[in-house]
């Protein structure tokens, strides 16, 4: 809740009105069906206690054609000085996302120690 308050304050100070913060649970993002164009998870997915349930919830909240972006530390790169439990391989991310009906769109390799992998809901 504290981070939500901080985000809301930050947005209000800047006059941003097209962002709505939502406090999720461990298993759901608590968003209405087909209400989201884009979901971005930066170094989050590997930390989830219930990743399958959360991803199902995200997919349900996406509009048709909506996208999900996973940004995770590259497990494939031993030079990335992050503990292995905080890394994910592109193969692992692709396997999990496609199992939830998402279609791989592209992989962004320009980040120094992470990959950003973009999927689209059909």
Indicate residue ranges for each PLM-predicted region:
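Conserved class I S-adenosyl-L-methionine
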Residues: 4, 67-94
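A short beta-strand submotif of the Rossmann-like class I SAM-dependent methyltransferase core
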Residues: 37-42, 54
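A short acidic, Gly/Pro-enriched loop at the edge of an enzyme's catalytic core
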Residues: 29-39
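Class I SAM-dependent methyltransferase SAM/SAH-binding core
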Residues: 1-29
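Short helix-capping segments at alpha-helix termini
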Residues: 12-17, 64-65, 101
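Core SAM-dependent methyltransferase catalytic element
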Residues: 100-122
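A short glycine-rich, Lys/Arg-flanked "PGG" loop and its adjoining helix->strand segment in the class I
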Residues: 52-67
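A short His-aromatic
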Residues: 44-47
């Amino acid at each position: 809740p504290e981070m939500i308050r901080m985000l809301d304050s930050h947005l209000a100070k800047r006059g941003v009105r097209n962002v709505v913060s939502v406090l999720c649970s461990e298993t759901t993002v608590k968003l209405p069906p087909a209400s989201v164009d884009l979901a971005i998870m930066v170094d989050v997915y590997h930390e989830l206690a219930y990743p399958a349930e959360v991803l199902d919830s995200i997919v349900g909240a996406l509009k048709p054609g909506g996208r999900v972006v996973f940004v995770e530390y590259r497990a494939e790169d031993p030079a990335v000085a992050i503990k292995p439990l905080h890394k994910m391989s592109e193969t692992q991310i692709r396997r999990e996302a496609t199992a939830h009906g998402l279609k791989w769109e592209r992989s962004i390799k320009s980040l120094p120690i992470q990959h950003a992998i973009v999927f689209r809901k059909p």
